[in-house]
UniProtKB/Swiss-Prot annotation:
Organism expressing this protein natively: Chloroflexus aggregans (strain MD-66 / DSM 9485)
Name listed for the protein in its UniProt record: Transcriptional repressor NrdR
Gene designation per UniProt: nrdR
Molecular function via GO: ATP binding; DNA binding; zinc ion binding
Alphabetical UniProt keywords: ATP-binding, DNA-binding, Metal-binding, Nucleotide-binding, Repressor, Transcription, Transcription regulation, Zinc, Zinc-finger
Entry similarity comment: Belongs to the NrdR family.
Any one GO biological process: negative regulation of DNA-templated transcription
Length: 174
């Protein structure tokens, strides 16, 4: 592989590791000319998969488009780059497991949302607000209420108790 620093055509692999359950191979390389080290990632190239959008148009599957959307939703959130990469890998695995030549954008969006909901709730709401194209604040509120209800159920509380507690805490700070 060509060195990205001096462009010498020969490098040595000094370390190889499997990442994300073998989905990706990370290689540390060293240039034979300048001695600089750099990292490369190897993954299976996705087949010619087409995404069917809501309006019926088709476009080639683009892993990077999913990654950009997730990174945007996670902007300034405590979510690591590795966690984002893992999420994108999981979505891509789900997409490829369908073994279809065409897949709906809804399938991809839903797969991202399911994983984001568990990863970071604020990122989930951010992504949902774009993906679901909320027409008004009421629809956004419904999504937040749904998330709060799910969180309350997971913690063994009703959503009303969670909301009341949050309200009490907010008033006690004033």
């Amino acid at each position: 592989m060509r060195c990205p620093i001096c462009h010498f055509p020969e490098t040595d692999v000094i370390d190889t590791r499997k990442l994300y359950e073998g989905e990706v191979i990370r290689r540390r390389r060293k240039c034979r000319a300048c001695g600089r080290r750099f990292t490369t990632y190897e993954r299976i190239e996705s087949v010619s998969l087409m995404v069917v959008k809501k309006d019926g148009t088709r476009e080639p599957y683009d892993r990077e488009k999913i990654a950009r959307g997730v990174r945007t939703a996670c902007y300034r959130r405590p979510v690591s780059a590795d966690a984002i990469e893992q999420l994108v890998n999981e979505v891509e695995t789900a997409v490829m497991a369908t073994d279809q030549q065409e897949i709906s954008s809804q399938f991809i969006g839903d797969a991202v949302m399911r994983r984001l909901r568990d990863l970071d709730e604020v990122a989930y709401i951010r992504f949902a607000s774009v993906y679901r194209s909320f027409a008004d604040i009421g629809k956004l509120r419904e999504a937040v209420d749904e998330l709060l209800e799910r969180e309350g159920t997971r913690n063994g509380h009703s959503s009303a108790a969670t909301t009341d507690q949050g309200t009490t805490d907010n008033h006690s700070r004033m």
